[in-house]
Structures are given as C-alpha cells and as structure tokens.
C-alpha cells in the first residue's frame, strides 16, 4: 500500500519533466521561426503570429519598405505616423510602410491599444483604426480598462464607418490570435535590438535619431527612400534581414 503514493509521486515527476521538455522544445521552435524571418520585409501570416501578417500601408512588395516599430501610446509615434502615411501616398506604389508594435512597459494602455489595432486588422480596418488611435491618443492613454474599451469600441465604429462587427472586435481584442500577433511583433523587435519608439528602418537602414519636426523628419526620410529606390533600381537592393 505504501508503494502507491511513491508510484503516484514518480508519475507526477515524470509528467512534470515531460511538460518542461515539451515547453522548451516549443520555445526553441518559436525562436528559430522568429530568427528565420526576413525582418526588413513583409512578414506573412502564420499560425505563430495568429494568422495576422504585418500591418501595412501602400505596397507590401514595394522597392522601398519602411518598417516602423512603434507604440500606440508613444507621443513621438503619434507625431510621425501621419508623416509616414503622407510619404507612402506621395510615392504611389514605390514605397510601403510596415508597422510592428514595440510596447514600452511604462505605457499604461500601450498593450491594450496594440490589441485593439490588431482586432481591427482582423476585419480589414487597421490603417483607419491606427490613424484614429494616434490622433486621439490623449483621450485614452490614462483611462481605466472599462472606459478605455468603450472608447476603443467607438473608434472601431468610426474606422469601419459602422460597417464592422463591434461585438466581434471586442471579443478579438482578447483573442489568442491577437495575443500571438503582438507577441511576434515584440519578438522581432527584440531580435533587431529595438530599444525606443519610433524606430524606423528603410530597406534595412536605420533612420538616425532626429527631431520629429515635420520638415526635418520628412527631408531625412525622403533622402533615405530616394537612396533606397536608386539602389533597388540599379539592381543592388538590400537583401539584409
């Protein structure tokens, strides 16, 4: 009779070790997948990112790709996001903007905002929703969860022009798909050593830290895009991950 507790304890230990090994292998496979991604290019949807590919404006296959790592609660990101949208529009198909979340730990509602934006993306409204989030940042950045989610729902209704499913949006905000998407964005950001927002990379070249003054910012981005396009058109485009 005394052997039964010992056997049960042994089985428990074996089960725990098996779970640890499985978890370790899963983490290893995930890290290998992240490392394999072409980080200066569009990342396709995959089960590991919740079947949500990169959010983007313009052409995801453009010769010049701007990759922005940003936090929806970051004031500097709110300033530069519309500038980048305007630049993408100016180049008409030659430039694309890829957006990845890099959430700063001290931003109270940064994670919730990233979840909301990706929930909107599931219904095809990411660009409109992101624009509204940044434009109205001061309205939601300090709200408690209940009032914040009501506000986020109203933004979704505005972004979708009341054509989207608002209840589905609220459900998707806390879905596994959205959590996986944000996790993968953060993992990619960590891999390329992102430490601040906004961080902007154009065809693998990092934009230097500059003033977010509109004319200075746009001038520098234009110069980098023109150089990237010239390089791409000469057949020596950047293949760096």
Model-flagged regions — what are they?
Residues 77, 106-107, 179, 215:
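Loop/helix-junction capping segments adjacent to catalytic residues or to phosphate/diphosphate-binding pockets
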Residues 56-57, 140, 173, 207:
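Short clusters of hydrophobic/aromatic residues that line enzyme substrate/ligand-binding pockets
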Residues 47-64, 89:
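A short beta-strand-turn-helix
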Residues 64-65, 197:
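Short loop/turn microsegments at loop-to-beta-strand junctions
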Residues 67-72, 78-160, 190-192, 220-223, ...:
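Structural alpha/beta surface segment adjacent to cysteine/selenocysteine redox centers
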Residues 1-24, 157-241:
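C-terminal cap of thioredoxin/glutaredoxin-like
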Residues 26-42:
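Ser/Thr/Pro/Gly-rich low-complexity linker/stalk segments immediately outside membranes or between
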């Amino acid at each position: 009779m005394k052997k039964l507790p010992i056997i049960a304890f042994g089985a428990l230990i074996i089960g725990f070790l098996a779970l640890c090994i499985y978890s370790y292998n899963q983490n290893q496979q995930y890290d290998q997948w992240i490392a394999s991604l072409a980080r200066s290019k569009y990342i396709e949807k995959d089960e590991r990112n919740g079947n949500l590919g990169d959010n983007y404006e313009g052409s995801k296959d453009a010769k010049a790709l701007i990759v922005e790592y940003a936090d929806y609660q970051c004031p500097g990101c709110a300033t530069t996001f519309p500038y980048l949208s305007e630049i993408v529009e100016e180049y008409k198909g030659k430039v694309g903007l890829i957006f990845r979340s890099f959430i700063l730990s001290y931003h109270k509602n940064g994670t919730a905002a990233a979840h909301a934006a990706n929930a909107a993306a599931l219904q095809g409204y990411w660009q409109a929703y992101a624009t509204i989030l940044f434009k109205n940042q001061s309205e939601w950045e300090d709200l408690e969860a209940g009032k914040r989610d009501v506000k986020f729902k109203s933004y979704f209704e505005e972004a979708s022009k009341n054509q989207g499913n608002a209840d589905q949006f609220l459900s998707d905000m806390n879905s596994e798909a959205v959590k996986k998407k944000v996790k993968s964005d953060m993992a990619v950001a960590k891999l390329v050593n992102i430490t601040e927002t906004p961080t902007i990379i154009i065809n693998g070249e990092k934009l230097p830290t500059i003033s977010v003054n509109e004319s200075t910012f746009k001038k520098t981005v234009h110069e980098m895009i023109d150089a990237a396009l010239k390089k791409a058109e000469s057949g020596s485009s950047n293949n760096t991950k």
